Amino acid sequence: MIVTSMFRGIACRCELQLLLTPRRMLRNFSSLEQKQSPKIESLPPEERGKYKVATIPNAICTARIAATPLIGYLVVQHNFTPAFVLFTVAGATDLLDGFIARNVPGQKSLLGSVLDPVADKLLISTMFITMTYAGLIPLPLTSVVILRDICLIGGGFYKRYQVMSPPYSLSRFFNPQVSSMQVVPTMMSKINTVLQITLVALSLSSPVFDFSTGANDVIVGLGCITGFTTIYSGLQYASGKAIKKI
């Protein structure tokens, strides 16, 4: 009996060691993730598009992100004309990817709901920083815009962590099939985005078209309104009104 118990104890310890090996643990986590994640093939056709990654709007957003450093570099170098042209094209692509996502079946995705505002914020933040460096936008307004965006990004990551269920990993964190959530812009946020883009476009075109003093005064007034909407929409996001768990 004693010998049998010893062999059983040794066998149990060996089995436990096998289960706790790194490779086996990763395999167990992977199988658990597969059980907790919905299979795209098992979803209705109208639901499958939400989990797509390779969509036309996502490709357009990626191109806009890739072009952002070039536009910022042109502003820093005071090459305002090509910077204005590229910024106008980037703004047009923002409208284009939104139109495609809303009107073309299978092109609206959860990744796009996050990637599109990230691309917008990256472009706008880059423009505000570089245009402040070039003397086109005042530093206090840029500080408000950048601080709001940093808080939104940090809050978005924290909210994503909150809606996730264990086990926690980077692959599951960025997997749209795991505890999905969607960012829904508020009306004030949409107005703020339009005002920010308009302010950047007018400020950037001022040295290109040599605006008069009166036109520059209008830009200053627009900057004050933009500062207010930036703060107000940031408070709306902080309250969680723009985050929806799916």
Curated annotation (Swiss-Prot):
Top-level taxonomy: Eukaryota, Metazoa, Ecdysozoa, Nematoda, Chromadorea
Transmembrane domains' residue ranges: 80-100, 127-147, 191-211, 218-238
Key words of the record: Lipid biosynthesis, Lipid metabolism, Membrane, Mitochondrion, Mitochondrion inner membrane, Phospholipid biosynthesis, Phospholipid metabolism, Transferase, Transmembrane, Transmembrane helix
Subcellular localization: Mitochondrion inner membrane
Any GO BP: regulation of cell population proliferation
Family per similarity comment: Belongs to the CDP-alcohol phosphatidyltransferase class-I family.
Species: Caenorhabditis elegans
Keyword Lyase: no
KW Ribonucleoprotein (keyword) present: no
Catalytic activity annotation: a CDP-1,2-diacyl-sn-glycerol + a 1,2-diacyl-sn-glycero-3-phospho-(1'-sn-glycerol) = a cardiolipin + CMP + H(+)
EC numbers: 2.7.8.41
A molecular function GO annotation: cardiolipin synthase (CMP-forming)
UniProt-recorded name of the protein: Cardiolipin synthase (CMP-forming)
Cellular component, GO annotation: mitochondrial inner membrane; mitochondrion
Gene3D superfamilies named in the record: 1.20.120.1760
Primary location class: mitochondrion
Function, in words: Catalyzes the synthesis of cardiolipin (CL) (diphosphatidylglycerol) by specifically transferring a phosphatidyl group from CDP-diacylglycerol to phosphatidylglycerol (PG). CL is a key phospholipid in mitochondrial membranes and plays important roles in maintaining the functional integrity and dynamics of mitochondria under both optimal and stress conditions. Required for proper mitochondrial membrane organization in germ cells, but appears dispensable for the functioning of muscle cells.
Top-level taxon: Eukaryota
Classification via InterPro entries: CDP-alcohol_PTase-I (IPR050324), CDP-OH_P_trans (IPR000462), CDP-OH_PTrfase_TM_dom (IPR043130)
Bilayer topology term: Multi-pass membrane protein
